[in-house]
Curated annotation (Swiss-Prot):
Membrane topology according to the record: Single-pass membrane protein
GO molecular function: proton-transporting ATP synthase activity, rotational mechanism; proton-transporting ATPase activity, rotational mechanism
Subcellular location: Cell inner membrane
Organism: Haemophilus influenzae (strain PittGG)
Protein name from the UniProt record: ATP synthase subunit b
Keyword Cell membrane among record annotations: yes
Length: 156
């Protein structure tokens, strides 16, 4: 019965091997596996947190971008409104200036017309006196001459 003694010896050797493995080999392996599981779980949790944070950040960026677009549109609208107001003001000022220049031109023309008319009256009066002197054949004194001219100017 050698087979039984060998079998018992192998059984004892196997039991010692299992005990040795359970005592010295398995704990570091189990610790390494548990550590690795913990690291993987932490990495997955971090990845989920990062994914959630990225989604939140993306939403925040989209909201900020929308707000910036709205604000930019408001600024553009305000600028366009101000531009139109300035254009209207400039047009009104230009119209006022145009009317003022035209009125000033008319006033200058009227003043020049009156000056020329007065000058013409004086020349006509002088010519009339000169003609009258020639007709009468004598010279009228200066005071009488001015008096006649003033009367003619008043009549004209």
């Amino acid at each position: 019965m050698n087979l039984n003694a060998t079998l018992i010896g192998q059984l004892i050797a196997f039991a010692l091997f299992v005990w040795f493995c359970m005592k010295f080999v398995w704990p570091p392996i189990i610790n390494a596996i548990e550590t690795r599981q913990s690291q993987i779980a932490n990495a997955l949790a971090s990845a989920e947190a990062a994914k959630k944070e990225q989604a939140d950040t993306k939403n925040l960026v989209e909201q900020e971008l929308s707000a910036a677009k709205v604000q930019a549109q408001e600024i553009l609208d305000a600028a366009n409104k101000r531009r139109n107001e300035v254009l209207d003001e400039v047009k009104a000022e230009a119209e006022e200036l145009k009317a003022k220049i035209i009125a000033q031109g008319y006033a200058e023309v009227e003043a020049e017309r009156k000056r020329v008319q007065e000058e013409l009256r004086l020349k006509v009066a002088s010519l009339a006196v000169a003609g009258a002197e020639k007709i009468v054949g004598r010279s009228i004194d200066e005071a009488a001459n001015n008096d006649i001219i003033d009367k003619l100017v008043a009549e004209l």
